[in-house]
């Protein structure tokens, strides 16, 4: 429980040959998709828009000027934990909409502000996402925070498809969850 890193490795396979890309762990960032949903649920809990155990019916969200956004398949009725286990995009979209103070209606306008984005980013940073790990390496990448503010991108942020994070940040995030919310400084 110290945050000590014992080894770092990154390999890329191309044409049946391995190449060392260990530095990508600190210097490259990626959209991480559904990995983010544990932190997204935490955003909902901390802002009192997710009630533990409350069920909703999975489906699609249709926002004005935005194509329908759905889970990968119809997942039926879901509570917060089942939505996380089955990776429901819809559940995260509904949480994000509630976070803006709106109630979902088909084809609604969804005005969002930088403050709505920051509600997610501030909680994500508590897990080490989008912030420096403070590891003792020069030029650590902290990922890219998208600067365009739109309802579509806001919903994408909630499912890990907008901002980018480094593999080292994801390691920090997973370790924070595994340590019951205690975030250790990586060293």
Protein language model regions, located:
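Beta-lactam-recognizing serine transpeptidase/beta-lactamase-like catalytic domain environment
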Residues: 1-28, 42-187
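Active-site His/Glu-centered metal-binding helix of metallohydrolases
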Residues: 35, 39
């Amino acid at each position: 429980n110290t945050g000590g890193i014992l080894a770092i490795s990154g390999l890329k396979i191309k044409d049946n040959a391995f190449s060392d890309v260990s530095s990508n762990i600190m210097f490259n960032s990626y959209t991480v998709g559904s990995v983010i949903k544990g932190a997204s649920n935490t955003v909902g809990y901390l802002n009192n828009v997710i009630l533990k155990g409350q069920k909703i019916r999975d489906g699609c969200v249709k926002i004005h000027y935005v194509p329908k956004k759905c889970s990968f398949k119809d997942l039926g009725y879901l509570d917060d934990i089942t939505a996380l286990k089955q990776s429901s995009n819809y559940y995260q979209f509904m949480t994000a909409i509630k976070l803006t103070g709106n109630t979902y209606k088909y084809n609604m306008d969804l005005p969002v502000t930088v403050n709505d984005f920051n509600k997610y980013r501030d909680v994500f940073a508590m897990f080490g996402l989008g912030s420096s790990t403070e590891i003792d390496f020069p030029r650590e990448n902290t990922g890219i925070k998208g600067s365009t503010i739109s309802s579509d991108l806001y919903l994408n942020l909630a499912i890990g498809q907008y901002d980018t994070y480094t593999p080292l940040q994801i390691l920090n995030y997973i370790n924070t969850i595994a340590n019951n919310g205690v975030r250790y400084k990586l060293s």
